[in-house]
């Protein structure tokens, strides 16, 4: 009976540990998405010499050759 108890405790610990790591990965992906969105927004005309595609900014049509 004690062996069954130890197996249940071990199984619970393993499941808890793996689900915690999975949620950490999701949080990392969310943070990366937010950082990338700030980079794209930052180079939409605010920095003329930025190394990004100017047409990624929807509200500045002159950067895409439409307003010239």
Curated annotation (Swiss-Prot):
Q: In which tissues is it expressed?
A: Expressed by the venom duct.
Please give one Gene Ontology molecular function term for this protein: toxin activity
Where is it found, in Gene Ontology cellular component terms? Answer: extracellular region; host cell postsynaptic membrane
Asked whether the keyword Disulfide bond is assigned, the reply is yes
Where is the PTM Glutamine amide found along the chain? 66
- Which key words tag this protein in UniProt? Acetylcholine receptor inhibiting toxin, Amidation, Disulfide bond, Hydroxylation, Ion channel impairing toxin, Neurotoxin, Postsynaptic neurotoxin, Secreted, Signal, Toxin
Which residues, if any, are the signal sequence? 1-16
| Domain comment quoted from the record | The cysteine framework is IV (CC-C-C-C-C).
Q: Which residues carry this modification: 4-hydroxyproline?
A: 48, 54, 61
Q: What is its main location?
A: secreted
Q: So what does this one do?
A: Alpha-conotoxins act on postsynaptic membranes, they bind to the nicotinic acetylcholine receptors (nAChR) and thus inhibit them. This toxin has higher affinity for the adult subtype (alpha-1-beta-1-gamma-delta (CHRNA1-CHRNB1-CHRNG-CHRND) subunits) (IC(50)=2.3 nM) of the receptor than for the fetal subtype (alpha-1-beta-1-epsilon-delta (CHRNA1-CHRNB1-CHRND-CHRNE) subunits) (IC(50)=22 nM).
Which named protein is this? Alpha-conotoxin PIVA
**Subcellular localization:** Secreted
Name the InterPro entries for this protein: Conotoxin_a-typ (IPR009958), Toxin_14 (IPR012498)
The cysteines joined by S-S bonds are 43-57, 44-52, 55-64
Tell me its family.
Answer: Belongs to the conotoxin A superfamily.
Q: Identify the propeptide residues.
A: 17-41
